[in-house]
Amino acid sequence: QEQFQLFLFDADYWWERIVVPGGLADYIAEYLTQFYYHVWAGACILAFLYVLLQRLVWKLAKEQGAADVYYPLSFLPIIVLWHFMGDENAMLSLVVALLLALSASCWYADLKGKWQRVAYILIVLPLLYWTAGAAHFIFMGWVIVREFRLNLKGKNFWGGVGVFWGVGLWGIGCPLLASMWVQFPIYRLMGGIGYYRFPAVIPWIE
């Protein structure tokens, strides 16, 4: 992919990327993609990112009480992603965005206070959308599942329903609000701008 881009170390290039949702993930990914010129370096970068993703997946699984016997299952999302990234039009931005989303989920899991978690969601969800793009839906889904389970344990079903609607509407509202400032169709704001080179023809993972 490095032959299709020209990474520039100047402020204009930075602002060109950062003013769109997912721009930070795009910027980091494009910086790393430069090193694909050396095949061994590109392979090492991808391997390192995949290992980080797997560790984050397992950390979140352990937070939900997963037994060690399920450790091999933590590789399944990475294998699926590895397969998808075999497409030359799949961009490294997706991997970086997933790392940002899973990192945000891990930091959320470390919060203890109720109001700390509420403030974190209100601030981080839109911030994550702007930096990582539509991968913020992963963080949104994680929060909903985790809080719903906590409310069910406390026999507070309707509290879980409230979290579902509140967090869900806030997460969906982020790309809708972004559409007021950036000139992209809704389907691209909802699906990620820089994850695939030709977004109108994203293939099925087969």
Where are these regions (language model features)?
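Alpha-helical transmembrane segments
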Residues: 1, 70-80, 119-126, 162-173
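Membrane-interfacial interhelical loops
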Residues: 2-32, 81-82, 86-88, 174-205
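Membrane-interface micro-motifs in multi-pass membrane enzymes
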Residues: 18, 22, 46, 69-116, ...
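Solenoid-like repeat scaffolds
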Residues: 34-35, 129
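Loop-to-helix entry region of an early transmembrane alpha helix in multi-pass inner-membrane enzymes
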Residues: 36-51
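Transmembrane-helix motifs of polytopic, lipid-linked glycan transferases
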Residues: 47-64, 102-107
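Membrane-interface helix-boundary motifs at transmembrane edges
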Residues: 58-69, 110-116, 147-161
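Transmembrane helices and adjacent periplasmic/lumenal helix-loop junctions
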Residues: 89-92, 110-149, 169-182
